[in-house]
């Protein structure tokens, strides 16, 4: 059992209340939140790990990310979804070549530092799967299959199946592969 004693707890309830001088009792999930002065009455202080922090708040989940594009932000057009999607298709080949572990690691650290605990990562190439599977982020890893020219259908389908199989081999408590089917 762990106890996190907090000066303030920012709640994301309907009223966004702020609890002052409260503690969060948890193991794998939150069991109880109560005022700090009620901790002694529970009789668990001697057997629990006790930590303290000035502020605690819920972590954030970014439901739709594209970390594989992190190396190409300057080449993509962010003036609306249609412009962005067009720029992704135009720069598709360079996107996968420019990505590396250093860039991915930097992006994962930025997410964690900003309070993000989990992501829905949409991936066309699968290059970020191994790194996400080992990271502290919780990831729903969507293997994308994009609409394609009929001449390349078999090739695109085979590549997708291989990416999805590889992602499933990495599945763990924090990394869960899934499917994302697009047809632009």
Residue ranges and their predicted role:
Residues 12, 66, 124:
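Flexible loop residues that form catalytic
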Residues 117-118:
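Short acidic/polar active-site loop segments enriched in Thr and Asp
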